[in-house]
């Protein structure tokens, strides 16, 4: 199992913060070619978000996720639309089952801790729920739940595509 650590996420975030618009555009062009189904689905769903900042959050989160996995493996096989739909539907049903009586933080933490990439999923949740900031989330409760499931699906599929080797991303390597 490959693990993306908090240090690796911080390192990738630091790199993104120092990119200009042309560099970010080039990265996004590469993403669109490498993972068209994932990028298309996530960005397509983000168009439905009510708040522009939420759409920016989605693009930022997806950038961190895709760059994190690119650090593990340069040429990740593309996720197909069928793979995404099947995985997303299964994930959505599982989350509905777990949270059918409402949100329970203990259940949520258990899901994150047992996930294939717990620190990456925790990062996603922190951005979506705006943890650590005094401001409220840019997402409605329904939007937040949907995008947690979407990103959990994206992470799980990319994790699967990068193979079973045990490795940690070393941010000092970058």
Regions found by a protein language model. Name each.
Residues 1-5, 10-174:
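Long compositionally biased, domain-poor regions of proteins
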């Amino acid at each position: 199992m490959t693990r993306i650590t908090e240090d690796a996420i911080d390192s990738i975030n630091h790199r993104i913060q120092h990119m200009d618009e042309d560099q970010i555009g080039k990265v996004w062009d590469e993403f669109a070619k490498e993972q068209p189904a994932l990028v298309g689905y996530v960005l397509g769903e983000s168009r439905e978000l009510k708040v522009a900042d939420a759409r920016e959050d989605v693009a930022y989160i997806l950038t961190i996720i895709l760059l994190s996995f690119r650090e593990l493996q340069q040429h990740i096989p593309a996720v197909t639309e069928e793979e995404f739909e099947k995985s997303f539907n299964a994930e959505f049903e599982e989350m509905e089952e777990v949270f059918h009586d409402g949100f329970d933080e203990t259940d949520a933490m258990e899901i994150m801790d047992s996930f294939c990439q717990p620190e990456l999923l925790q990062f996603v949740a922190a951005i979506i729920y705006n943890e650590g900031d005094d401001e409220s989330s840019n997402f409605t409760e329904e939007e937040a739940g949907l995008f947690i499931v979407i990103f959990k699906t994206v992470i799980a599929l990319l994790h699967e595509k990068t193979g079973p080797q045990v490795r940690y991303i070393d941010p000092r390597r970058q």
